[in-house]
A protein has these predicted regions:
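Short, Lys/Arg-enriched, disordered terminal segments
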Residues: 1-4, 224
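H-loop (His-switch) and adjacent beta-strand-loop-beta switch element
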Residues: 212-224
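ABC family nucleotide-binding domain
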Residues: 5-6, 11-27, 31-208, 212
Length: 224
């Protein structure tokens, strides 16, 4: 039987400024355990806003977000941070690495101290699968954009969260590495029953997903 792990109910989000932008309009979507889903759409369609709302990094103006059946909308900043640490791995489009830490230190940072000691071999194997083991002791400024992106991906996967949310995870990679990342995410979804939601502008990467969701003008126009 399918199990809901992530849900948005009628969420809306408007960005106000000189020009008011309605990024999401009464959007509802359910993600089940072990799914690998791709969200596609043109730039400015609302796909990254939806991902940030699902990750509790952005607050919808209306509607509700549920994680593992728990209503998280309206919780305090500290409560949301706790939920993210336990249940969500997030892959940022702009890497979001700490410049004062090495690649390895960036990856283990979200992991509990005791688990870091026990899981060094596992983390090194993960880095090897992403072809960044040689970056273990390098700082972000010493790595290419593609290497930094793969460190960001390793950090999200290392915490073994139930949900992985990825904002353009292959955007800074060449075709071969992009395919490797998409395949790795797909396998992680299958082997560990992780729910993976990937925002991408690349139709070829979306083909790796079990389900494709298209966002157009802040609304879901395709969900299959």
């Amino acid at each position: 039987m399918s199990q809901k792990v992530l849900e948005a109910r009628n969420i809306s989000k408007t960005y106000k400024g000189e020009i008011e932008v309605k990024a999401l309009k009464k959007t509802s979507i359910i993600f089940e355990r072990g799914e690998f889903c791709a969200i596609i759409g043109k730039s400015g369609s609302g796909k990254s806003t939806l991902l940030r709302c699902l990750a509790t990094l952005d607050v919808p103006d209306e509607g509700e977000i549920y994680i593992d059946g728990e209503l998280v909308t309206g919780k305090s900043v500290s409560e949301l941070a706790r939920i993210r640490r336990r249940k969500i791995g997030y892959i940022y489009q702009d890497y979001n690495l700490f410049p004062e830490f090495t690649a390895y230190e960036n990856i283990v940072l979200p992991i509990h101290l005791d688990d870091r000691r026990e899981n060094r071999e596992k983390i090194e194997n993960l880095m090897e699968s992403l072809d960044i083991l040689n970056c273990c002791d390098k700082f972000p400024t010493q790595m290419s954009g593609g290497q930094q992106q793969r460190v960001s991906i390793a950090r999200a996967l290392a915490i073994e969260a139930d949900v992985i949310l990825a904002d353009e995870p292959t955007g800074n990679l060449d075709a071969k590495n992009a395919e490797n990342i998409a395949e790795l995410l797909r396998k992680s979804s299958e082997i560990y029953a992780q729910t993976i939601v990937m925002v991408t502008h690349d139709a070829q990467m979306a083909e790796y997903a079990d389900r494709i969701i298209r966002i157009k003008d802040g609304e879901i126009s395709y969900n299959l």
